[in-house]
Amino acid sequence: MIIPHPERHFFFRENPELLDELIALGAWTQISVDSLIGKNGAEAENFALQLLSRGSIHTLATDAHNTKRRPNLSLGYAIVEQRAGISAADAIRSRMLTIVP
């Protein structure tokens, strides 16, 4: 199971231990790059960065729902590398390839 955008959900921000329980059961999180750069508000950004520091980001999302919005996945990987190291970014890349080869 992939949990999309938990950083944008009040429920998970207020109850991060429940997200931890789902992850322990095998769920993955999908964090929006826009949240990592603050486009989804300070609360989403702070929680996304908290998840990153805890190693709880499994995949990244671009929110590119149409052809007019360009994906910024490379920016997301750059943030992950800067804050958590290249091995964390490589782990996310590898996981994403198992979903979309």
Predicted feature locations:
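Domain-core and long-helix interface of multi-subunit machines
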Residues: 1-54
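Residue-level detector of family-conserved "landmark" positions at structurally sensitive sites
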Residues: 4, 32, 61-62, 89-91
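Residue-level "edge-of-site" marker
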Residues: 7, 35, 63-65, 93-94
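Short amphipathic alpha-helical segments
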Residues: 15-16, 72-74
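A general structural signal for well-ordered secondary-structure junctions
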Residues: 28, 57-58, 86
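Short active-site-adjacent structural elements
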Residues: 37-41, 67-73, 100
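Short acidic/histidine-rich active-site segments
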Residues: 56-72
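Mid-to-C-terminal alpha-helical segments outside catalytic/metal-binding sites
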Residues: 74-101
